[in-house]
């Protein structure tokens, strides 16, 4: 009887140890995933306090419908305003072409930003990007061309988290500054009507009619940008070889 009880006890002990190890592994995996792929707004903002002011922040565009400022566009512009007015950013780069509507996203954002009080001399626009990876990469190149050294990517946590592996893979030097919702809720900002005519593309064809779903998904995942990065690296190698 004593032998049987000891055996049962050992089995239960092993089961508990196994369960504990499983929980530890799951927790470690979740923590690893969190650190690798999620841009925590609070942590990123605390980091920004140590590195501000950034020479420039990159703010990706979003489709605009005439006469309306949708919630996503509103949040991104308000966040840019908050960072600019509170000394976190010296300059702002708005990025985006006319992608899903006939209005050039970056130019619409610029007009709205000026309307709420951001100095136009500190606003730049990147007008080629049609996907998030392009928003980031093309604006990053523009920032470097303008001589900006410290750069941050300012958007929703979900979108910035999507860009975390991209940054790591191509060793781009910038910080993430995802929106801290509590900060923009407190802002008393109302968007007044703007003259949108300068941002309108008359012969506009939406992206969904220019690209298949497969091609569009590849663009979202950065296929076009990856090709451009590899081509740029190859060109530099050739130039260095010729110089030698």
Which stretches of residues belong to each language-model region?
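Short intrinsically disordered, low-complexity coil segments enriched in acidic
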Residues: 2-3, 26
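N-terminal Sec-pathway targeting helices
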Residues: 3-19
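Bacterial N-terminal signal peptides
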Residues: 16-28
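A structural signal for short, hydrophobic/glycine-enriched beta-strand patches
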Residues: 31-205, 233, 237-244
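Accessory cap/linker subdomain of secreted extracellular hydrolases
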Residues: 193, 197-224
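Low-complexity, Gly/Ser/Thr/Pro-rich intrinsically disordered linker/tail segments
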Residues: 213-244
